[in-house]
From Swiss-Prot:
Keywords per UniProt: DNA replication, Endonuclease, Hydrolase, Nuclease, Viral DNA replication
Record's protein name: Probable replication protein P12
Role played: Probable endonuclease which induces a single-strand cut and initiates DNA replication.
Enzyme class: hydrolase
Catalytic machinery residues: Y410, Y414
Assigned protein family: Belongs to the phage GPA family.
Amino acid sequence: MRSIAIGHEPIKGGLKPIELIRPVPFCSPAFGFDKAAEYAKEQLKKIPTTYLRRHAAKLYAARFNSTTAKNPEKSANIFMRELVKRVDQIVTRSPLNITELQRDKRRKDKAKQLALICQQMGIVDFDKSMTLEQATALVISKYQKLAEFTINQIDTAPAYSTYEAFMKKGGNPEILADKLEIAIRRMTCDKWWQRKLNRARDMTLEHLNITLGLVNKKKSPYASLQAVNEFKYAKKSQQKWLDSMQLESDDGETTLDLAEVFKGSVSNPEIRRVELMVRIRGYEEYAQEQGMKAVFYTITAPSKYHANSKKYNNATPKETQAFLVNQWAKARAELNKIDVPVFGVRVVEPHHDATPHWHMLLFMLPEHEQVTTKALRGYAMQIDGDEKGAEQARFTAENIDPSKGSAVGYIAKYISKNINANHIEGEKDNETGGEFNNENGLVLNVGAWASRWRIRQFQFVGGASVGVWREIRRAKPEMLDKSTDVLREIFSAADNSQFAQFINLMGGAFAKRSERPIQISRVADGLNEYGEEKKRVVGLESCSNVLKTRLMRFALKKRSDSDAPWSTENNCNHPANDWQIGAGDRLNPIAFIPKEIRNNVLRGATYYEVDEQLKTITEFKVKNNQLTQESIGL
């Protein structure tokens, strides 16, 4: 027997070789054993990250060393060729090369390069003799070039849908130019590019994990171990930041711990779950009052969108979700043409291989049930509807009998599973067979999946505005003394969690936004860094009368440092490691730099922070009036 290592995996106390093994005499160079090992090593170099290469090496070695396959070397080489082909497709589609996927600094450098290219492409020589029409046309022309460049890099560009709509349908070119000018500022900003590249990094690495078979019920369901660990770290960092910050009113009389405010908001998973359940219960009660019936639908994408299928087309969960959204849009358009309205809720959750599927609880008039189900089934099965098992696996519709159980009961499990698993602890997951709990495990994996792919898990169809619901629940009874009767009734319904009554008072489940008696009231609040007008919610508006629900303004500040608060006038929306020093601006205490050495860092010193648990060293320094941060592994 002879073996050749094509990689190594860490074990306690050292490294274990990943070996190709052949018996005598087939292990000699004359039989191509050495060439086979070299081929494997060369192919493995094309796979990003040590972890993924190691996993691919183990899969290749397992096939190569098989004692049951007729031709194990051929089987292993076919596997490697197909795997590298899929990996190459993923990396080619990404704006990042292998090195940039792995290193923060390379992504920062690339962001600066792309922003600089856009700045050079966006240079405009305005002549004083230019008319407004000429200047507008010039801005639109410059945007078109920058958008084409940006789309080639990251498949999207800011305001591109607005630009496309204008080119197809026309409109006011001056209004368009104002919007495109803001988009141009984004495309010439390195921070904007860095956010986009970091997002591309997250999705590309997760896609690679999926295509290498690292996301499934045997390895890690719903999301890769890498995504789950990064999600856990992000949650831990978020909590640490929340604990370090507080809110202080403008007059300095009121101070609130940010962590406590968080616990009382819909950002708290339990409050979010309860609110969703209240809304769904209200939908059901309203439907019963209107004589409607409920149907529970489950829709799954064709097999070619599933990573565990032989037909897998290398699609990402994001692309699969886009496919499902498009098919749903077609079905709704068809129903709208024949005046068949529906309302309800959609829950998106992953299969164990990360492919999204939908659960929909829809309410409709009894006479509309068949045509609604026919439309949904038709578009769900429009692509590859004749493939094996499609009738059973791709679409199901279940009529809900109120005498056997409520509609809310059908959807409650899916809501809890995708938030915090409250009230379903210990229940078995159909996808993996594992048990739910509200601390980690499956719920954490689902959260990591939604976060990594930026997929909206819950979407209500029709009904009444939850924004108005939340805002009026902030009001106090004494605030409504001079309000209209309708406003007081709406407040009473919201204050007593009567969502069905709230829907009724807001004009019903199918009323247009313009027909609602109450709207959110917003006022201008300055410009953001791209010159875009910011809006601040102040309360509710009814018949030109404003009910102010936000009587105080708060600044965000560190609990241990009161001299430089975050506020809406002081870049409070910037990330915690990204602050700027502008002329006349106060410094934001966003940095993790100890106060006693902050001045030294501002004068050019470098500060290093060691994290023993994560085994990283983070370097902080000021460059071009901006605090930069880079982490490296120990």
